Structure formats: C-alpha cells, structure tokens
Amino acid sequence: ATATATSGIGQYRVDVTGLTSPSGNYVFAQDAANATALTVSPASLTVTAGNAAKTYDGAAFTGGSSLVFSGFRNDEAADILTGTLAFTGNSQGAINAGSYAITPSGLSATNYTLNFASGTLTVNKAALTLTGADASREYGAADPAYSATLTGFVNGEDFVTAGVTGSAGGVSSALAGSPVGTYAYTPTAGTYAAANYAFTQFVDGRITITPAT
C-alpha cells in the first residue's frame, strides 16, 4: 500500500505482490481499481468544554472555559486545529443563578471529524448576611417576631429589587421565664427566599427583657 500509519485522509493504491503462476502460463497485472482500494477516513475527535463557575453578580456571562480533547492520533495535539474557537449555548448572556451549557464550536482539522460536547456553567447564589434587629419584651411575655437586616446585595440591588420574599426567624437564649436582662438571639433564614441569593451568614441580635407592668 502507498499509505502509511500517518497518511492523511484520502484514497490510496494497494498493489498485490508475491503471486506466481507455477505453470508459467499467467502474468499477473494490477487491477485498475487497486489505485483507490484503500480509503483513509477521518478519525473522530471530541472537543469538550470544561466546567466553569461564578457567583451571581448581576453581570452577564460571556466567553467559555478550558477544553479537553479526546481522539488525537499519531501524537498529534491541539496545534493542528484550525478555525476560530467560539462558545455558544445558553451560558452566553446568563445572569441568574442556575446551570447553563457552555458549548465549544468553530474548530476543524483536515483528518478529523470534530464532535463538540458541552460543559456546564454554574452561577451560584450570592451570600447575604442576616443581622438580627434588637428587640425587647416584658418579663414573662413571648419573644416578639424576629427581624433582621440583610446585607450583601450586589449590582445595586436591595430587598425589593432582588425579589426577596418571606421573613426571618430566630433562636433566642432567653426563655419565657428568663429574668430581666439582655440576651442574644441568632437570626435564621426563616421563610426568606430569593432566586439569586442564599441566606447563609448570621450576626446575633439582642432581646432585652424589661420588668413586667
């Protein structure tokens, strides 16, 4: 054959040799079809986008990630690829917390059929800090409803524009029969919910117990 292990795609000649006619009555000639008897077809090369992550910041994601290649032959590498790498998928322009596809495209190679596989962009929720609001109650009464101040909003957002719903909870060190004094309580996320924020950091507030009247 005129092809070798490193020959590129195409059709190659295959010659049959070594045959003889014991009687000497025949002469062997190469068939015309032998000229294209061997076809080298493209190898399959998979190009996979790596995963990426960011924390919600109100800005749209653009661009891509690292690439992983699977299927190169003959010690070849990414430097044989041509074209302009681009990234598509619903990750492009993604803003809100969630998972999105990062899909590579735009590359080619003479001896390969390229298959593009997506990676995942994860936009994580931004963390909010809940600081317990100070409150008071009379001796023997129940604690008032807990409330908290939220900090950590990004991109100029606030409680309303960030779409926060619900209210804070709390765990108090003061019991119903605790004497007059000041006690710490730790706010909790309660029923708070928001698409792009997580309620994960907490600063204690104070409950002041005053004498009963």
Mark where each language-model region is.
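Solvent-exposed beta-strand/loop surfaces, strongest in extracytoplasmic domains of secreted
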Residues: 1-213
